[in-house]
From Swiss-Prot:
Keyword Zinc: yes
Primary enzyme class: ligase
Catalytic activity: NAD(+) + (deoxyribonucleotide)n-3'-hydroxyl + 5'-phospho-(deoxyribonucleotide)m = (deoxyribonucleotide)n+m + AMP + beta-nicotinamide D-nucleotide
UniProt cross-references to SUPFAM superfamilies, sorted A to Z: BRCT domain (SSF52113), DNA ligase/mRNA capping enzyme, catalytic domain (SSF56091), Nucleic acid-binding proteins (SSF50249), RuvA domain 2-like (SSF47781)
Residues that bind NAD(+): D33, A34, E35, Y36, D37, S82, L83, E114, R137, E173, K291, K315
Alphabetized UniProt keyword annotations: DNA damage, DNA repair, DNA replication, Ligase, Magnesium, Manganese, Metal-binding, NAD, Zinc
Domain BRCT stretches: 592-670
Cofactor: Mg(2+); Mn(2+)
GO biological process, one term: DNA replication
Assigned GO CC terms: cytosol
UniProt protein name: DNA ligase
Organism: Idiomarina loihiensis (strain ATCC BAA-735 / DSM 15497 / L2-TR)
Keyword Nucleus listed: no
SMART domains: BRCT (SM00292), HhH1 (SM00278), LIGANc (SM00532)
């Protein structure tokens, strides 16, 4: 029995030592925190039950990882220890009772409560108010000198203000805010550079760059959470909470969520409140830290091998777990995007049973190297769709299967298109594909397209759900009697809607082209195509080179147009629509009355009082101008109404002309 137990303990030690190295030294953990915590607790339980088998080098006795050779080693004069964990209110209550028993007092113990930030722990040493050293936690006894890197973090003060101790060591966490993390990874993908699995890895990896100029480009943020070394002559409050507020007065950033409570119930209330707001915070947290607030009582309680007796981290339900991929489905979104979705052995992640997770796209499948049958790490945060974040390749069975991306849409069998430079593959059967049907018909009926008055989104959804319309052409086949059976419709409303649909049977070529919903073909491009080709058959027959002769049509837009009209299902729907809809052939499709502003590009922003923005747009286009949606160096002038925002700021920075309504009126009347 003892032999098998001892063997299991050795296995756990080897695994935990390896995972510690991956986490603390390589900044690339291969397993989620929940899996590490599970193994750690198993080893700790076995060591408690079999103390004679416990190794002196056990991971349960250590903190972090050893410093790397490329950084100068720094000794911590006051050890930087870890924290013990509680995974339930019962475990926290047991901790509270241990505190009371050790203090042997009936007085109320006040706790300081703080969010447990999921980043990289660092030490900042100030001498006479000046930052002289930054260091990682390392193994708790010694860390790595990262002074030049921490100096690049924007909210780390290089000089403290006020009457500060001669020597002051501040401990805290460096994180990468969630919004900044998403932007950083997206930019890295565009540059085809390494992306980070999570903000914690990004923060830790950024701090350990040998070139501080790289760290300076990373959006890092520091939060102070405790003191280490302090000059002996310094008089500070006995309260940990008050000391944090003192740090704030000296210019150090402190988390605004900290507070003190006087009971176990107060701690539980704080835990539940932060857990409820977890997904609204702009940084990752994996629990709450409770510390005995009195520094004197902290000293009385002391430490064990790797953690203080006066603090504990109550962990949140894990947002990452391990499970197995049993298969992959390919879903079609409302814009035709094909998304691979992994089917999983059900697993509880963050308190929710997860049986599916997104794999995003073909590039992500290749990057992960994931196969059907793999053991994978699943992450779920808030309302974000669960996703596969990594493959545990040392747990890969022999019978895994490659994931094959389809060539045809799984819904309508139309061709799948992937434009060079884009990660997303799309179904080309826009007007025909059932998965895209609702959005395609809503767009077809919209004001700037066919402008079917009274055909709102809810009615479109009802028509599609009843399977009455499979394509926009079916709108023209609807009877008044059918429409009258819809909820809250009635005979009169049905007649009005039927008449509104019939009224659109005479339109313009430009509106019809725009209504088809071809990717990247907006209102202005549809006008340009109609003006250039004069009739639909010429447009349908056009090849990429001919299309690129049209103003504002580049290679990518041309490819979308060709793909749309070459798709057999789209050809069928267009042919059906032409049975109902007509327009003047061979005429100018736009309402251009003059070329006085030809070659000029305007952008409209803010609220106009004498006309709508659409009316201003039409008036400018009637004089030959182009109206764009964003400001650039090519913009001739910005038309700015009331409450103009970022577009006005950008236009001013580029030195562009700014036109108010009076100037616009003069321009239009000249």
């Amino acid at each position: 029995m003892n032999q098998s137990v001892h063997q299991r303990m050795q296995e756990l030690e080897q695994l935990l030592n390896r995972y510690n190295q991956e986490y603390y030294e390589n900044d690339e953990p291969s397993v989620p925190d929940a899996e590490y915590d599970r193994l750690f607790r198993e080893l700790k339980t076995l060591e408690t039950e079999h103390p004679d088998l416990k190794s002196a080098q056990s991971p349960t006795m250590k903190v972090g990882g050893k410093p790397l050779g490329q950084f100068r080693s720094v000794e911590h004069e006051v050890p930087m220890l870890s924290l013990d964990n509680a995974f339930s209110v019962d475990e926290f209550e047991a901790f509270s009772k241990r505190v009371e028993q050790r203090l042997d007092t009936n007085q109320t113990v006040t706790f300081c409560c703080e969010p447990k930030l999921d980043g990289a722990a660092v030490s900042l040493l100030y001498e006479n108010g000046l930052l002289v050293r930054g260091a990682t936690r390392g193994d708790g006894q010694s860390g790595e000198d990262i002074t030049e890197n921490v100096k690049t973090i924007r909210n780390v003060p290089l000089k403290l203000s006020g009457d500060v101790p001669e020597r002051l060591e501040v401990r805290g966490e460096v994180v990468m805010p969630l919004g900044a993390f998403e932007r950083f990874n997206e930019q890295a993908r565009q540059r085809e550079e390494k992306v980070f699995a999570n903000p914690r890895n990004a923060a830790a990896g950024s701090l350990r760059q040998l070139d501080s100029r790289i760290t300076a480009k990373r959006p890092l943020h520091f939060y102070a959470y405790s003191l280490g070394l302090i000059s002996e002559t310094t008089q500070l409050p006995d309260s940990h909470h008050q000391r944090l507020l003192q740090l704030k007065d000296w210019g150090l950033p402190v988390n605004i969520e900290i507070k003190t409570v006087d009971s176990v119930q107060g701690c539980d209330d704080y835990y539940e409140a932060i857990l409820a707001r977890r997904d609204t915070l702009n940084y990752d947290i994996d629990g709450v830290v409770f510390k005995v607030d009195s520094i004197r009582l902290q000293q009385d309680l002391g430490f064990v091998a790797r953690a203080p007796r006066w603090a504990i981290a109550r962990k949140f339900p894990a947002q990452e777990q391990l499970t197995t991929i049993t298969g992959v489905d390919f879903q079609v979104g409302r814009t035709g995007a094909i998304t691979p979705v992994a089917r999983l052995e059900p697993v509880n992640v963050g308190g929710v049973t997860v049986s599916n997770a997104t794999l995003h796209n073909a590039d992500e499948i290749e990057r992960l190297g994931v196969r059907i049958g793999d053991c994978v790490s699943i992450r779920r945060a808030g309302d974000v769709i669960p996703q596969v974040v990594s493959v545990i390749k040392d747990k890969r069975p022999e019978n895994t299967k490659a994931i094959e991306f389809p060539q045809h849409c799984p819904i309508c069998q139309s061709d799948i298109e992937r434009v060079e430079g884009e990660a997303v593959a799309r179904c080309t059967g826009g007007l025909y594909c059932a998965a895209q049907r609702k959005e395609a018909i809503k767009h077809f009926a919209s004001r700037k397209a066919m402008d079917i008055d009274g055909l709102g989104d809810k009615i479109v959804e009802q028509l599609v759900e009843r399977d009455w319309i499979k394509s926009p052409a079916d709108l023209y086949r609807l009877s008044k009697a059918e429409l009258a059976t819809l909820p809250r419709m009635g005979a009169k409303s049905a007649e009005n809607l039927r008449n509104a649909i019939k009224a659109t049977q005479e339109t313009t070529l430009a509106r019809f082209i725009y209504a088809l919903g071809i990717r990247e073909v907006g209102e202005a491009t549809a006008n340009a195509l109609a003006n250039h080709f004069k009739n639909l058959d010429a447009l349908i027959a056009a090849e990429s080179e001919q299309l690129q002769e049209v103003p504002d049509v580049g290679a990518v837009v041309a490819k979308h147009i060709v793909a749309f009209f070459h798709e057999a299902h789209n050809q069928q729907v267009v042919a059906e629509l032409r049975e109902f809809i007509s327009w003047p052939e061979g005429e100018e499709a736009s309402s251009v009355q003059s070329d006085r502003l030809s070659g000029n590009t305007y952008v409209i922003t803010g609220t106009l009082s004498t006309m709508t923005r659409d009316e201003a747009k039409s008036a400018l286009e009637a004089l030959g101008a182009k109206v764009a949606s964003s400001v650039s160096k090519k913009t001739t002038a910005l038309v700015a109404g009331e409450n103009a925002g970022s577009k006005l700021t950008k236009a001013q920075s580029l030195g562009l002309d700014i036109l108010d309504e009076n100037a616009l009126a003069e321009l239009l009347s000249d």
